């Protein structure tokens, strides 16, 4: 069945933007819910029982399929196209839930691995200013801005643990109850600096292709005994949506490739006492990158408002073309806010960061001091149909036809699909 009641809970913010949900129907509550279903221990807010048919099950195994960017809008479009999506809707329950803010993979994988909100763990975006490093870096690949290999920040002597304000993982908490956590990770990042932190306490199974990942997942489900959480993240659909845009034939083909492969491999799984969960971290919006509005090209004087870090690096805006976080020299704050609102107020919500905190866009208070230092001073949230960004040749630009991070319904409404047999 489709449990679409939560759609009415998304409150308007301004224009076509809506507020995220954290209290119940939220991606943020997936880790606590998995922990509760497998251990009986309640660590905090849970997904409501109607996501599971009215009462919480207590399976022996939980399998989480984390399909990057395949949110509510795409489930609505494709639910009748594939055997597994039809089965979730016809035999299980499909519920819209809120993504985090920002609606990004960096925030979401950190929350899923640590069990706390970005308000606490402080890693909220791909491009993010880390005060301990004195510069804006790309968080998950742990590299400086520009063209650098993954984990290049290690060569600069940066401690990757300083990216996160929290380090105990959900896997370590499950282990204290005798529950195994088995995470399926692509070889390109399985041993990365970030992944070693976020998957501490888990068994990591590596793969190179989707088919390899799904066969290994199926074999593990069939072989494992005892309580276990198995989780597979797949980023292929998101990658194509970025490169070509959602709604294109490339995007549709990648979606078909994922689900048809899944249907084929899991057509005869036949394992009982296993609960399957399907979720996403966000959706996607399309804009031609050639139409990107660059703040500092429209108003070159804005470059003078950026502060310098203690290591003499300019603190460039963090975020993406869908969510921009600007650090501004204190003495220029009022002037910067006025200029930004006057020049870009027709295409974006432009507010002091304190507004986002007061509106609890990052979740309930308190906010960790480290997150507050990273956020900067001014938040720019583009309305639907617009990319707004900062242009720094070789470092920051807008080349993607698809993006996310903002607060439109297309970006923010994710999904929780639940079924007990495939």
Question: PLM features: residue spans?
Answer:
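Feature captures the catalytic ectodomains and active-site-proximal regions of enzymes
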Residues: 1-422
């Amino acid at each position: 069945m489709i449990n679409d009641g939560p759609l009415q809970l998304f409150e308007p913010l301004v224009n076509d933007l809506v507020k995220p949900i954290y209290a119940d129907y939220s991606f943020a509550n997936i880790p606590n819910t998995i922990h509760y279903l497998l251990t009986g221990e309640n660590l905090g807010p849970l997904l409501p029982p109607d996501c599971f048919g009215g009462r919480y099950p207590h399976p022996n195994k939980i399998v989480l399929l984390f399909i990057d960017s395949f949110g509510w809008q795409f489930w609505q479009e494709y639910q009748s196209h594939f055997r597994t999506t039809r089965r979730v809707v016809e035999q299980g329950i499909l519920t819209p839930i809120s993504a985090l803010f920002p609606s990004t993979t960096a925030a979401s994988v950190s929350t899923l691995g640590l069990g706390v909100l970005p308000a606490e763990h402080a890693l909220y975006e791909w491009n993010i200013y880390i005060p301990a490093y004195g510069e804006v870096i790309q968080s998950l690949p742990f590299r400086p801005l520009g063209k650098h290999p993954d984990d290049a920040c290690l060569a600069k002597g940066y401690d990757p643990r300083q990216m996160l304000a929290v380090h105990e993982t959900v896997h370590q908490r499950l282990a204290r109850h005798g529950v195994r956590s088995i995470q399926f990770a692509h070889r390109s990042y399985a041993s990365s600096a970030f992944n070693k932190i976020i998957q501490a306490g888990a068994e990591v199974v590596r793969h190179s292709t989707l088919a390899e990942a799904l066969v290994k997942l199926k074999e593990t489900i069939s072989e494992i005994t005892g309580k276990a959480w198995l989780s597979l993240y797949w980023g292929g659909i998101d990658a194509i949506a970025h490169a070509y845009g959602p709604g294109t034939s490339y995007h549709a083909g990648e979606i078909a490739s994922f689900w048809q492969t899944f249907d084929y491999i899991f057509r005869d799984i036949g394992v009982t006492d296993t609960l399957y969960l399907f979720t996403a971290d966000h959706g996607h919006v399309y804009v031609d990158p050639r139409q990107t509005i660059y703040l500092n090209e429209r108003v070159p004087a804005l470059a003078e408002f950026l502060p310098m870090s203690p290591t003499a690096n300019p603190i460039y805006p963090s975020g993406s073309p869908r969510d921009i976080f600007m650090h501004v020299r204190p003495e220029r704050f009022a002037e910067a806010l006025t200029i930004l609102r006057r020049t870009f107020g027709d295409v974006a919500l432009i507010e002091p960061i304190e507004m986002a905190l007061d509106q609890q866009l990052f979740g309930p208070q308190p906010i960790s001091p480290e997150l507050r230092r990273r956020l900067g001073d001014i938040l720019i949230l583009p309305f639907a149909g617009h990319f707004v960004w900062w242009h720094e040749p070789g470092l920051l630009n807008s080349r993607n036809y698809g993006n996310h991070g903002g607060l439109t319904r297309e970006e923010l409404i994710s999904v929780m699909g639940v079924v007990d047999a495939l």
